[in-house]
Design a protein with these regions (language model features):
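Short hydrophobic/aromatic beta-strand immediately N-terminal to the Walker A/P-loop
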Residues: 4-8
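Conserved glycine(s) of the Walker
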Residues: 9-14
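A conserved segment at the C-terminal end of the G1
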Residues: 16-29
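Short mixed-charge
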Residues: 27-42
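Conserved nucleotide-sensing/catalytic segment adjacent to the nucleotide-binding pocket
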Residues: 38-90
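Well-ordered, non-membrane alpha-helical segments in soluble/globular domains
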Residues: 63-75, 93-96, 133-148, 170-176
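Conserved phosphate-donor/acceptor-positioning beta-strand/loop module used by diverse small-molecule
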Residues: 87-88, 103-125
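NTP-dependent small-molecule kinase module
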Residues: 149-194
């Protein structure tokens, strides 16, 4: 069985930090084609997106038209692994989630539901560290609304993660999602060894 774990949340909720923590120390192979992704041959996981210094990693680092490649790619019978990991806004859309289901994937959506004040502090710290401007609140509000709408529409696949520290988020995620548990514990998820 193929399983996908997609991490969503408003800007500054900790999506990139969480995914980087889940995959820390794994040997990595980066690819640009057919879609920007990282293959972790040991333990056998694909992470969609790219890592960039200063934030905006994951699927946010992909082309605006990434969905046109991602949709058929996850339905390809030659997909290199049975476990998929992704975070970010770019592919957090109904069309991609439906493509995963249509391709035979079990979908798990981890919603990082942190207080807006904490997310704002993190965004400010990220902007200061990168020497960039703070994201406009109207844009952040739009992203927050998009996430809330997505979570509402896909509620049967959503696991709410409400803790604030990365370590507690991982613990809560492991408790709620068999895919996350497989990633963290190095267990087997229905035939896929990690």
């Amino acid at each position: 069985m193929k399983a996908a774990l997609y991490v969503v949340g408003e800007p500054g909720s900790g999506k990139t930090t969480l995914v980087e923590s889940l995959t820390a120390g794994w040997p990595r192979q980066e690819f640009d084609k057919p879609l920007g992704h990282v293959l972790f041959p040991e333990p056998g996981v694909v992470e969609l997106g790219r890592r960039r210094e200063g934030g905006f990693s994951g699927t946010d680092a992909l082309s605006m038209s990434a969905i046109t490649v991602a949709e058929p790619w996850v339905q390809d019978v030659f997909f290199p692994t049975d476990l998929l990991l992704a975070e970010g806004d770019r592919l957090a859309v109904d069309r991609f989630f439906q493509a995963l289901l249509d391709g035979g994937w079990t979908l798990h959506v981890a919603w990082l539901d942190v207080p807006a004040s904490l997310a704002a502090e993190r965004r400010a710290a990220r902007a200061a560290a990168a020497g960039s401007e703070l994201q406009k609140e109207s844009w952040v509000a739009g992203r927050r609304t998009k996430v809330m709408n997505l979570v509402s529409r896909w509620e049967d696949h959503v696991v709410r993660i409400g803790n604030h520290s990365t370590e507690l988020m991982i613990a809560e995620l492991v408790e709620a999602s068999p895919v996350a548990a497989a990633l963290v514990r190095g267990a087997t998820y229905q035939g896929a060894t990690v």
